[in-house]
């Protein structure tokens, strides 16, 4: 492992001193390492990124999401040094950075392949893949009015309802927006997709889990303005068509996980309780 990328979120508190320390830690493990620094993911999706052996992300979970979309087609593994709020995906804290880099070069890690989503808009040029690691969300526009949606799974009608919107989430995204919409937490290596309605006008409309190979077709039956498509809470597009199709992408996000990191411990401390870890209690 000699070609290392570092993607920095410039909105976070990342001083030159921090970056110099990271350079030092890398060169202590591999004096011949070549380091390429990216700022706010600019240039990260270029073909040259294919040569990178790994990318370190300095930011929060949102920076991880952007990095994952940029690198998905290049099969480059990533890991995050948390400089954000939650740090669920960017799980390495700054004080543990040196140890993480040491383990990286010693090969003391595993790679988790996470499902990603793709979205096709009926009648729209497919040059934009609309990849997502967490979720793809279809919602009403700015007006405070609900929208009528009809959902088909593998070309079979599932249900029709009125709501503020619809979330289609991956297992990775199950701890994000869909969790707030009442969806379940899904273990990250399961091959499933989740549909979670947002504020449905019916007590009988609940989130559902589907086989990961399912094709989900969402049709907008009644609208007062063009609905909005949101990718990972970061990309935004007004939808002028009445139909979108969401399915599993052929690309995956490759997350580097170090052996001392326990998913359930992270879940307890950062999602379930957000409090002091009490081992065994």
UniProtKB/Swiss-Prot annotation:
Indicate the principal place this protein occupies in or around the cell: cytoplasm
According to UniProt, the reaction catalysed is: NAD(+) + ATP = ADP + NADP(+) + H(+)
Q: Which domain of life is it from?
A: Bacteria
InterPro entries to which the protein is assigned, alphabetical: ATP-NAD_kinase_N, ATP-NAD_kinase_PpnK-typ_C, NAD/diacylglycerol_kinase_sf, NADK
* Keyword vocabulary terms for this entry: ATP-binding, Cytoplasm, Kinase, NAD, NADP, Nucleotide-binding, Transferase
GO BP annotations of the record are: NAD metabolic process; NADP biosynthetic process
Q: What is its EC number?
A: 2.7.1.23
- Give the binding site residues for NAD(+): 61-62, 134-135, 145, 164, 175-180, 234
How is this protein annotated for GO cellular component?
cytoplasm
> Which segments of the protein form a coiled coil according to its record?
none
Please give the Gene Ontology molecular function terms for this protein. Answer: ATP binding; metal ion binding; NAD binding; NAD+ kinase activity
Q: Which residues form the active site?
A: 61 (proton acceptor)
The cofactors required by this protein are: a divalent metal cation
Q: Which family does it belong to?
A: Belongs to the NAD kinase family.
What is this protein's name?
NAD kinase
């Amino acid at each position: 492992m000699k070609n290392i990328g570092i993607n920095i979120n410039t909105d976070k508190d990342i001083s030159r001193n921090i970056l110099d320390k990271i350079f030092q830690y890398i060169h202590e493990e591999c004096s011949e390492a070549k380091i390429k620094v990216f700022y706010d993911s600019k240039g990260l999706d270029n073909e040259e990124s294919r040569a990178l052996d790994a990318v370190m992300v300095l930011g929060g979970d949102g920076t991880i999401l952007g990095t994952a979309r940029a690198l998905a087609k290049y099969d480059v593994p990533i890991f995050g040094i948390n400089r954000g709020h939650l740090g669920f995906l960017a799980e390495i804290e700054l004080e543990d950075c040196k140890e993480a880099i040491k383990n990286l070069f010693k090969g003391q890690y595993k790679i988790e392949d996470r499902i990603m989503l793709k979205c096709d808009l009926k009648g729209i040029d497919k040059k934009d893949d609309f990849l997502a690691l967490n979720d793809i969300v279809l919602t009403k526009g700015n007006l405070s009015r609900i929208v009528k949606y009809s959902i088909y799974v593998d070309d079979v009608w599932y249900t029709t309802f009125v709501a503020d919107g619809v979330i289609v989430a991956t297992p990775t995204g199950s701890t994000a927006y869909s969790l707030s919409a009442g969806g379940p937490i899904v273990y990250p290596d399961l091959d499933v997709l989740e549909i979670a309605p947002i504020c449905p006008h019916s007590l009988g409309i609940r989130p559902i889990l589907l086989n990961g190979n399912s094709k989900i077709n969402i049709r907008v039956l009644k609208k007062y303005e063009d609905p909005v498509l949101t990718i990972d809470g970061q990309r935004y597009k007004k939808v002028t068509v009445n139909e979108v199709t969401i399915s599993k992408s052929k690309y995956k996000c490759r997350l580097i996980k170090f052996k001392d990191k326990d998913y359930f411990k992270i879940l307890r401390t950062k999602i379930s309780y957000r409090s002091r870890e009490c081992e065994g209690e």
